[in-house]
Amino acid sequence: MLISSLLPAVLLIGYVRYRDRRRPEPMMRIIQAVIYGLFSAFLAVPLAMALEGLVYSSGYGIFAVLPFVRGVFSAFVGAAIPEESMKLLMLWLMLRNCDDFDEAMDGIVYAVCIGMGFAGLENVLYVFQSEDGWATTALMRSLLAVPGHYIFAVLMGFFYSLAHFYPRRYRKYRYF
């Protein structure tokens, strides 16, 4: 169960490291980024709960009438915004004074490692929570959730690198 939960994240970290083979990042920085990703998951949970609490404390309003709207809104406010903002915070904390952040590809590598740390922990929690159908859960999350975190991390790292290495031209992306 544990291997099936972590394998997709490990493979995607291996892939992004392979793509960065010209000037690879130190292994300790990669491990540090994965740990930052794990930590971002722990930070995202209380933020998600607080945001959902703010939204739903108003008596639900449109959410009580339209469950679909509630589900979509919950997915963005309760999942996407807290998760991605915490991963971005961890990326910023890691790279703000990092001497190894010396080329644009590095932003992508570190963002992916943070994202895969987050996705790996999330996968483990989901798979161990679904005791009976753990294989199906692991397979579906391997095909959907982990690649989603990977794609978002690549985009985050790309735009973070643009803002870092080309501050005047891409200043508008600095906080995305």
Role assignments for model-derived ranges:
Residues 1-176:
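Hydrophobic alpha-helical segments at protein termini of multi-pass membrane proteins
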